[in-house]
């Protein structure tokens, strides 16, 4: 197995020792990725998380200037920034604006790729809304996830959620869906 590894950095002390002795020129290339904002949670948990498109674009520029080669993008509902969105037009807009300012920054849109189940158990459409925006990378979540997610109250001046909400998340991707995506 080790013959197939580009580098084995499971032992952190080995990694630090190699870096200390040889410097960066002896290390394998790395891609620094910055996840701009969370998929479900936002400024209610960390005021530094950008939610609006303008703020995310600026954060992408700042990350690029700090050395990031890739940004991971989630979009928010412009009428309620406390809610995630799967609007393909929002992904297209943010990608276009980031590319205008940082043409060689790799854009990684979240895609999930699977389906969510409604309260009646019926599966929805494939979650691939970000793909028409033509990101260089799209994150696909290969898993089955049945969980509860706590959406925290958004304190003033944030709007969109006046109290904590517990929501159920039922997500699944099967072999056929993964092959289609």
Predicted segments, located by residue:
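Acidic (Asp/Glu)-rich catalytic clusters
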Residues: 23-28, 64-65, 99-102, 126-136, ...
């Amino acid at each position: 197995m080790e013959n197939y590894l580009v580098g084995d950095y499971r032992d952190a002390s080995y990694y630090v020792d190699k870096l200390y002795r040889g410097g960066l020129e002896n290390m394998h290339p790395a891609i620094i990725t910055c996840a701009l904002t969370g998929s479900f949670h936002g400024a209610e948990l960390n005021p530094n998380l950008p939610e609006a498109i303008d703020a995310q674009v600026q954060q992408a520029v700042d990350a690029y200037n700090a050395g990031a080669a890739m940004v991971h993008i989630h979009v928010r509902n412009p009428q309620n920034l406390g809610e995630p969105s799967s609007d393909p037009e929002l992904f297209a807009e943010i990608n276009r604006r980031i590319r205008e300012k940082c043409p060689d920054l790799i854009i990684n849109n979240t895609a999930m790729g699977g389906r969510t189940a409604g309260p009646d158990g019926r599966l929805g459409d494939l979650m691939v809304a970000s793909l028409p925006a033509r990101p260089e990378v799209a994150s696909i979540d290969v898993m089955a996830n049945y969980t509860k997610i706590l959406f925290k109250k958004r304190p003033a001046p944030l709007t969109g959620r006046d109290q904590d909400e517990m929501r159920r998340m039922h997500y699944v991707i099967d072999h056929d869906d993964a092959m289609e995506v």
